[in-house]
């Protein structure tokens, strides 16, 4: 089955639309967010397991009941083997190491969870097709977007989920408002600001939105506030 094509503007709309339905005030200012409230809001159930012993997969979206292999601990030792479990439809499975980690891990968890939510919202048509798998597994590389090949189905699906997650977690107007406040800017700059001068402001803004530095940097570059 062909993957549906969406422009980045359309994907941003999907992110904003979920905010409008979930909590429209998030569109204008940074607010605390429990991403698992979003999971429940879209009709899914969260679960946490050690998906791999090397954390190569951080999240899984389950589109129908299916067997799946998980591990008893997050570190491989000789003689260890995975065990089979049954994952139920509507499950968003997150690697337990993210839920057990430090602040930075929590920020990665936030992006991973919302990324998986958008797989569920946008891509059921694809994964419920008998020709395709019943689950979508997402690696840290795919979440960061560095390896994505937009001439492949999976690369396109990952880009779409990434873009929507960024728009949901870092809404355009809210990011502009908060960044300009942090940087004490009275007006939107006519030219993007130099990255090296804005790093501390990027870090502070990222903290407000509970995301890591790089996702906020990319978002601000996309908006046109800082140089690429």
Residue spans for each PLM region:
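Active-site hotspot residues in diverse enzymes, especially metal/ion-binding acidic/histidine motifs
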Residues: 1-228
